[in-house]
Swiss-Prot record:
Binding site for CTP: K68, K70, K140, T186, N290, R292, K309
Record remark on domains: The N-terminal 20 to 23 and 27 to 29 residues seem to play a role in the cholesterol-dependent gating of this receptor.
Annotated organism of origin: Homo sapiens (Human)
Regions of this protein lying in the Cytoplasmic compartment: 1-28, 359-399
Record's protein name: P2X purinoceptor 1
Cited Pfam families: P2X_receptor
Transmembrane regions listed in the UniProt entry: 29-50, 339-358
Gene3D superfamilies assigned to the protein according to its UniProt record, in alphabetical order: atp-gated p2x4 ion channel, atp-gated p2x4 ion channel domain
Amino acid sequence: MARRFQEELAAFLFEYDTPRMVLVRNKKVGVIFRLIQLVVLVYVIGWVFLYEKGYQTSSGLISSVSVKLKGLAVTQLPGLGPQVWDVADYVFPAQGDNSFVVMTNFIVTPKQTQGYCAEHPEGGICKEDSGCTPGKAKRKAQGIRTGKCVAFNDTVKTCEIFGWCPVEVDDDIPRPALLREAENFTLFIKNSISFPRFKVNRRNLVEEVNAAHMKTCLFHKTLHPLCPVFQLGYVVQESGQNFSTLAEKGGVVGITIDWHCDLDWHVRHCRPIYEFHGLYEEKNLSPGFNFRFARHFVENGTNYRHLFKVFGIRFDILVDGKAGKFDIIPTMTTIGSGIGIFGVATVLCDLLLLHILPKRHYYKQKKFKYAEDMGPGAAERDLAATSSTLGLQENMRTS
């Protein structure tokens, strides 16, 4: 065991491998070798250079987004009467940026005021005062309990609370949605981007979009792919959802703006690509999107509020992109990597020659030659023997 270890160590320390060129005339190996080289060449030129643009250096972007909406809706509700809803009423927040909500449906509890009343049965049902702990508020409570058990309606008793009365009852969601006209509302997106590495700035109001065109155009993925004005119904439709269904309980829609620019061409070819994605799943545990807000007012010295439970569509605008431009350093790096990949052909063909073909032992003898230093005079004797062999071969060819 020790002797073998010494031999392995000596071989590692004192042996040197040098390549040996062997010309092999074998049609099968030759064809495989050229086919592998062809595949590597197509990969380097077609994929690495042309598709992945390995000759370019790239830069990410910084972005700013602002939006404006337009449209009107009319409702007729008990306690509120006829009401016209404009952009100041149905958009949250008022200063739209890359994330905003358009109200499409709501439940209103009119003229709430601070006082005592029975809480909603969702907060808990009682039979007597002992079931209502004073001052205690459960998770779904709508006020502070007074300790009394009072009638909520003719059949149910609940704990009395001190809070905004009458309490909200949101069991029945209006169908169809109250602001179904939102399907025809229009959304104007302004997007400014910059590629700081290349000092290039662009807006989605590209050269083809002018003032006259913007007054009449609506985005369409084939007819008007650069128009920055979008109809909400079309956006929801392209996201794979139904607007009427989505408007009832609300949902989330993603709008992506992709800037993938090749700056080796003129900058006017750097244009945005819009895509729409449905981020709402009706079958999940908590479907829809909703929140609450209140309108406060004073009447005869008493503070009142109209409480709105709002169902709306939330739009999230996401900007992504990358720009590329020719650079000698990544070009040379890619070329060097491609040349290195050509070595795969040699490795595979050596594997075929030395381990798979029937004549593999013969090729091994031709491929590998072992030389050992035999001391002074050994080189001269080996050279003389080689010369004699070559002379004999020459005489045989001429005879």
